[in-house]
Amino acid sequence: MNSMSTTGPIRVAAIPKHYLQFTVRTYTRSMASAGLRYSNPPLVKKCYDQPTGKRFISSTPQSQIKDYFPPPDAPKIVEVKTAWAHPVYSEEEMRAVTVGHREAKNWSDWVALGSVRLLRWGMDLVTGYKHPAPGQEDIKKFQMTEKEWLRRFVFLESVAGVPGMVGGMLRHLRSLRRMKRDNGWIETLLEEAYNERMHLLTFLKMAEPGWFMRLMVLGAQGVFFNGFFLSYLISPRTCHRFVGYLEEEAVLTYTRAIKDLESGRLPHWEKLEAPEIAVKYWKMPEGNRTMKDLLLYVRADEAKHREVNHTLGNLKQAVDVNPFAVEWKDPSKPHPGKGIKHLKTTGWEREEVV
């Protein structure tokens, strides 16, 4: 009796820790993979060259697939116009975007940076992502497929649209409550949220989330929205610094995806054309409408959000004017603006813009 009562626990405890971690990660990645399928059968058949007629990622019959968000059935309407026209980026400006990091200088910065690292850990876990050290990109465990990149993009963009909406909403209510102007912050924050949503809609034209991905997004968005809402009430400066650090991670993610594409690790994307929604939104010119061009545009947007939020984090939240929504006295000098011509990785300091 005694030997039997102790044998079971000993055998369970003898399972190596690394095996348990591998099992959890493998299960998470397989479930997340099952939660994402390509939503355009003709495009997938063309670009993924599946002679058997099966899609690259899916368990759903092709006959059941339809446009994930088809245009509304309104015969009298040609197109829905947006209030925020996207600025035109040049290819030179987009290629000049680099990975960067703003050093934490005070307790507020450290709280923001620590929170981003925690969020990054959770996102890496659910999307199966491992960031390689320099020179380790060719190691198999660090390699990402097109399917895995899309899964990460969809999850990332579904969460990235939350901060701008929360910040804009709270500042809008504050302006109404105090009966004072907001000095241009609301428009920029709402435009940021809209831009992140357009990223998501673009990637959803390429892959349709399944039930598991929807569940992950629902949980992450619910927790993140409420957490960010409360945090913004306590310290808006910390929240903007948090978003600045989060966008640093986004720039890093898209930079690595671009490098993988350029090095031939993502062959199915080499000749893939950007969805029509992306062509119209970014005003992509003829001859520059490939998947690589799309990633360059998205990365440039993330770099702009990085600059904007690091800059807003440097300002006095209650009194300073938003420098990205003003007309400058001397336009010949470099100033913050909607474009990326004078992009600053770590944001503009308060002395430079006030």
From Swiss-Prot:
EC number: 1.-.-.-
Transit peptide location on this chain: 1-64
Binding-site positions, Fe cation 1: E157, E196, H199, E302
Biological processes annotated in GO: alternative respiration
GO annotations of cellular component type: mitochondrial inner membrane; mitochondrion
GO MF, any single term: metal ion binding
Sequence segments annotated as region (Disordered): 333-354
Localization per Swiss-Prot or TrEMBL: Mitochondrion inner membrane
Pfam family membership, one: AOX
Assigned keywords, A-Z: Electron transport, Iron, Membrane, Metal-binding, Mitochondrion, Mitochondrion inner membrane, Oxidoreductase, Respiratory chain, Transit peptide, Transmembrane, Transmembrane helix, Transport
Top-level lineage group: Eukaryota
Segments passing through the bilayer: 153-173, 215-235
Cofactor dependence: Fe cation
Segments of skewed composition (Basic residues): 335-344
Cofactor note: Binds 2 iron ions per subunit.
Membrane topology: Multi-pass membrane protein
Biological role: Catalyzes cyanide-resistant oxygen consumption. May increase respiration when the cytochrome respiratory pathway is restricted, or in response to low temperatures.
Name of the featured protein: Alternative oxidase, mitochondrial
The species this protein was found in: Emericella nidulans (strain FGSC A4 / ATCC 38163 / CBS 112.46 / NRRL 194 / M139)
